């Protein structure tokens, strides 16, 4: 919808879990039957429950889900879907939330976004480069492999979705951009194909290469940015 503004949130400082894909997308494994041609950027971020932002994130997600689910159920009851005679419509049901309490004083949040989309007019596939900034909020031109154990903050939006035959109604934590505060290149991350082949004393890439037109990464928890209907 023209002029629509989506609300963008900022997470607390957390630790990336293994198998993060932030410098390049995860395309799955087509040969094994779970390929993803659009590609996905993703990271599971674990925060301490003592961080006030952690509970605030949980509250925001739950509130968004409850409001969206209630509206969807009301619409379902007012206008039941038409199905073939003898079949029952799929009734509303809720799915898992995109976070879980680990039982050790931490909570893990699951963020992701597609790495490409199809232009509705030209049908052309357009790729999305996830913005990653350094601890000063400046854009990193060549994003390093970000492994499990890295310290991050993320900007994200909340995208509620309805139930279907595969999953129940829930909320997607749509990844918008990432702040890399402390880099842990190795440690089992999804991109760490050379993690077991380290050679000491050799060439090491610079930790952060910044663009000339450095952009500030604001800390506003409720920053509003234009929504792009064609991203997802």
UniProtKB/Swiss-Prot annotation:
The keyword DNA-binding applies. It comes from the Viruses. One of its GO terms (molecular function) is single-stranded DNA binding. Pfam families: SBB_T7. The acidic C-terminus is involved in modulating the ssDNA binding properties. It is also required for dimer formation and for interactions with the viral DNA polymerase and the helicase. Single-stranded DNA-binding protein that participates in viral DNA replication, formation of concatemers, recombination and repair of double-stranded breaks. Coats the lagging-strand ssDNA as the replication fork advances and stimulates the activities of viral DNA polymerase and primase/helicase. Coordinates simultaneous synthesis of leading- and lagging-strands. Together with DNA primase/helicase, promotes pairing of two homologous DNA molecules containing complementary single-stranded regions and mediates homologous DNA strand exchange. Also promotes the formation of joint molecules. Homodimer. Interacts (via C-terminus) with the viral DNA polymerase. Interacts with the viral helicase/primase. Part of the replicase complex that includes the DNA polymerase, the primase/helicase and the single-stranded DNA binding protein. This is Single-stranded DNA-binding protein. The lineage of its organism: Viruses, Duplodnaviria, Heunggongvirae, Uroviricota, Caudoviricetes. The gene is 2.5.
